[in-house]
UniProtKB/Swiss-Prot annotation:
Keywords: ATP-binding, Chaperone, Cytoplasm, Isomerase, Nucleotide-binding. InterPro entries: Chaperonin_Cpn60_CS, Cpn60/GroEL, Cpn60/GroEL/TCP-1, GroEL-like_apical_dom_sf, GROEL-like_equatorial_sf, TCP-1-like_intermed_sf. It catalyses: ATP + H2O + a folded polypeptide = ADP + phosphate + an unfolded polypeptide. It comes from Protochlamydia amoebophila (strain UWE25). This is Chaperonin GroEL 2. Its EC number is 5.6.1.7.
Length: 540
């Protein structure tokens, strides 16, 4: 094992503090409406310009190993906040630095770090209660647009687009953000269920110009296994032909004789039919087929539950008003499933989302939920250059995730105001505590003003003066850094999602308290690389 360097007590804490401050200084310049951009060099391609705190934090790696430990711990604050709430990463970083710096001063003066930690944790519980008490549910489209606008760095166009997307796909719908191909940012909404499987043969196309197969008022056969022999589906085909309606076959695969016969009948006899592979794999495929069955009001034909393809009747088929298939994807519009059955299935999926511990599984379940009850909205981000597009995409991502958080837990007055309104409650708690626990609560009370002070400083104002003014104001009043005025934050549309504020606080305290209780740090001794050998002389 390689030898290690070890640092103890104050020496260790000062090294960590330097790393924390270095990372925080790079991140906090992005906070607020007048926050600045950070340019990140890339080993390939053009530099990345961003105003997204977590993107900046993720790029920071310090040369000094001990300082880097502090930086990496605060990077974790930003990442965790981004994962949970989707925004608030810069706020979390600013809070973590303020709490750690303030706490370190007290530890240096002889305070017990463990008692400070206990005091801080008690204060967090009080602050979270205060935030929840002040939180307002998001009721109208205007508030959704305002939350998105603030998160997108006051870009009203993005805010409006996200509000429009939520209005169209509903609160359970999915909004995805992709790079566009033009200058304009566009919203594309897909109603109904869409999955990434296309027709199995180009001969199924009904429109050769658009290369689509469009089936109106169609029956849908949903089968769990492969279909190879045509004799398995002949009775069902005859029954469907008699109704004069088209048939869409969704199965694990349609191959060989079955596919060839369907194609020949499509071309020669004008049979209105199309076959497509089922979406997903394994258990997820089975679940998605069941979703399609519920959406279309049909049954999943599965031998596991005793249903055979040869004995399937027309009553067991699903129905859709319209099915649109391209070579890559299928969209089912207006299935005949009952609202009660669809909502019941949606509740099941929501329970699975709550119980799941895997982020990947949660994401896939959320996609299924959106396809079942809402729809999918895609925002195509447009810009003149690739650099601008990446910067804008970061902002749209932030706005979209902040909006989802606002819909989930409600909103608070923004601009750091919500934290200021919690200070009296924390001071009351501190009065009921003793010793270093009391000091821990006082540290939290002082640190809560850090985001507001930073927003003011980024706007070119004196943070302490702005703080003094805001403390004397009414509950919802605060400082609008964009205009330099004191306003009613809710009326002015300066809002923060409660979930974002809460997660930023909880993650900041968690890491800052852990760092405060650190007494020793251990790192590898840096290897000294030998100097390169001198080139061989060329004299003959």
């Amino acid at each position: 094992m390689a030898a290690k360097i070890i640092k103890f007590k104050e020496d260790a804490r000062q090294k960590i503090l330097k790393g924390v401050r270095t990372l925080a200084d790079a991140v906090k310049v992005t906070l607020g409406p007048k926050g600045r951009n950070v340019v990140i060099d890339k080993s390939y391609g053009t530099p990345h310009i961003t105003k997204d705190g977590v993107t900046v934090a993720k790029e920071i790696e310090l040369e000094d190993k001990f300082e880097n430990m502090g930086a990496q711990m605060v990077k974790e604050v930003a990442s965790k906040t981004a994962d949970k709430a989707g925004d608030g990463t810069t706020t979390a970083t600013v809070l973590a630095e303020a709490i750690y710096s303030e706490g370190l001063r007290n530890v240096a003066a002889g305070a017990n770090p463990l008692d400070l930690k206990r005091g801080m944790e008690k204060a967090v519980k009080v602050i979270v209660q205060e935030l929840k008490k002040r939180s307002k549910t998001v009721d109208d489209r205007n508030e959704i647009a305002q939350v998105a606008t603030i998160s997108a760095n006051n870009d009203a166009e993005i805010g409006e687009m996200i509000a429009q997307a939520i209005e169209k796909v509903g609160r359970d719908g999915t909004i995805t953000v992709e790079e566009g191909k033009g200058f304009e940012t566009e919203l594309d909404v897909v109603k109904g269920m869409k999955f990434d499987r296309g027709y199995l043969s180009a001969y199924f196309m009904t429109n050769s110009e658009s290369q689509e197969c469009i089936l109106e008022d169609a029956y849908v056969l949903i089968y769990e296994k492969k279909i190879s022999a045509i004799k398995e589906i002949i009775p069902l085909l005859q029954a469907v032909v008699e109704t004069g309606r088209p048939l869409l076959i969704i199965a694990e695969d349609v191959e060989g004789e079955a596919l060839a016969t369907l194609v020949v009948n499509r071309l020669r006899a004008g049979l209105k039919v199309c076959a497509v592979k089922a979406p997903g794999f394994g258990d997820r495929r089975k679940a998605m087929l069941q979703d399609i069955a519920i959406l279309t009001g049909g049954e999943l034909i599965s031998e596991e539950i005793g249903l055979k393809l040869e004995t399937t009747t027309i009553e067991q088929l699903g129905r859709v008003k319209k099915a649109v298939l391209t070579k890559d994807e299928t969209t089912l519009v207006e299935g005949a499933g009952t609202k009660a059955a669809i909502l019941d299935r949606a509740s099941q999926i929501k329970r699975q989302i709550e119980e799941s511990t895997s982020d990947y599984d949660k994401e896939k379940l959320q996609e299924r939920l959106a396809k079942l009850v809402g729809g999918v909205a895609v925002i195509h981000v447009g810009a003149a250059t690739e650099i601008e597009m990446k910067e804008k995409k970061d902002r749209v991502d932030d706005a979209q995730r902040a909006t989802a958080a606002a819909v989930e837990e409600g909103i608070l007055p923004g601009g750091g105001t919500a934290f200021i309104r919690c200070i009296p409650a924390v001071n009351s708690l501190a009065d009921s505590l003793e010793g270093d626990e009391k000091t821990g609560a006082k540290i939290m009370a002082r640190s809560l003003s850090a985001p507001l002070r930073q927003i003011a400083e980024n706007a070119g104002q004196e943070g302490a003066i702005i703080l003094q003014a805001v403390e004397k104001m009414k509950e919802k009043e605060g400082y609008n850094a964009l205009t330099g005025e004191y306003v009613d934050m809710i009326t002015a549309g300066i809002l923060d999602p409660t979930k974002v504020v809460r997660c930023a606080l909880e993650n900041a305290v968690s890491v800052a308290a852990m760092l405060l209780t650190t007494e020793a740090i251990v790192a590898d001794i840096p290897e000294e690389k030998p100097a390169p050998a001198a080139p061989v002389g060329m004299d003959y």
